[in-house]
């Protein structure tokens, strides 16, 4: 490390001239120069940025003045801006456009970053300065946001080993380095295992039941892979879901189900030992830091506060929703037997198929009826238009802003008074270099600079939506439109941020609070007033008929029990991994024991959730998956206020903006929520919405 630092300082001028990551960003709004950045630029840029950040830390530590909020806490907050910017770009590209070269680079870069952050968190002199200011906090004249930054800085260092000494400190360093490497390896394995499966079909009876849109997409994939005249299905979300919903061939549905649910179980990309080791490391870290398990360590900094409160929520929901879920499955089995004319043992690969048929029969509604009205460009206008109607925002497409892939689009976002709010990138379609799922992220967060400028954010929405085909534009399913709204809610949280400090800005909030803005946005989708603004037939321009809108509303409670219990499965499994304190010898037995209370369909030998549970073992949701349900309680309660005042009520929207979206982590989440809602959230709103109460 010392050699790297010396080398980088001696070559700074030469490196900066050649490396676009180390020179000032001069494009509009100082956006990242993606058109100039090469993968080989990242390692030297990150090495130099680490050295620059370390020099800033050294200047804080070595100063002779007594510790103050300004010379220690604020100085620490403002340090490392170049490193933060470069690493945000790198890891976002790794997830959205991560080829083999990027993955290999990440395996070299991540240990450097972990070591660097450990060097800061475990710097005893730095922590003593932070601790001195923290202990004086009641005698200092600090603003609310400054007090929050002080508290978060102290807690952040303490929770990352700063209070440890001697062998415990070194052990923490070793464990965090290993954890970083394993999390990266886990994600890499999931992506590679997902890309490894392809099912090429050539016979007409193999594709029976599939709609033309799915066949067109599969034919295009097959052609790209050299299988002219065939149909290729894989484990990308649009391809897999269409097949599971519509394919009549039960054996082929089973084949895809098994392929998806045995990913990273055995073979070249086996994650089982990695999962066990990650859980073991997290448990040891928690013990080192004085907690009985990793869940207690995590939840100390969450709205839920402890695992008892999490389990109380999960068990309360399980008790309320499981009877409905069991009834739904029983009715679905009866439907399947009636359809087939003989007894049917409902298996996991049957659920999507028969539920799609049942839903169609009960409500005369399916995705193929709705997709012509959900053309992506129109949906985009509708989603952006909702932000205009609620908050007065406008979105101006700007093709001059550089992008990291030709399919990415960029928009300048402006407030109601015409002032610039931020940049929004959209990246909608699957590709082999992109992780599955959907997410919002940022290339730059909002903050107030040293010069007092409100530096606005650069936000990105990354999806895996159904691609356009040679004959049709991109037509979305209802669920994909809902996903768009969900991630757009996160985007608004980032775009409207108005905090002084970057670490407290936008979505940098507790995990069980961060899903409130995203899940709230989903509530508008079934509302007729909203649907009529954008749901127009892509060929005729016809507005989505009232009859279909009513059918959408009628289906809102379809299998609400099943879907809730399904989410509880993930929440229970996550909590089981992070409340256990012994090494797991049999990962399959452990998983089955954890999720047995939520099982509604037969367990299939060889399948495993944990080996591909990216939220928890590759992302930031460890001991946090319950947060989706926690936030659902919040979003139902929050939307009930919009229902009372009018779903487009500007005053209610303004209250949500001022008290939630703009505030970030500047105050405790419950304080902010109560200020918006006038009281604490009540679970009854969610249960009423779902027809459970």
Predicted stretch roles:
Residues 26-41, 90-109, 132-174, 234-273, ...:
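Short His/Asp/Glu-rich catalytic/ion-coordination signatures at enzyme active sites or charged loops
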Residues 16-211, 642:
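N-terminal helix-rich structural modules
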Residues 149, 181, 188, 192-234, ...:
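Active-site-proximal, well-structured secondary-structure segments within enzyme catalytic domains
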Residues 1-8:
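Bacterial N-terminal signal peptides
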Residues 82-92, 151, 155, 351-359, ...:
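Short, hydrophobic/amphipathic alpha-helical patches that form generic packing surfaces
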Residues 15-37, 48, 230, 361, ...:
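C-terminal, non-catalytic "cap/extension" segments appended to globular domains
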Residues 466-485:
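Short pre-active-site segment immediately N-terminal to the catalytic Zn-binding motif
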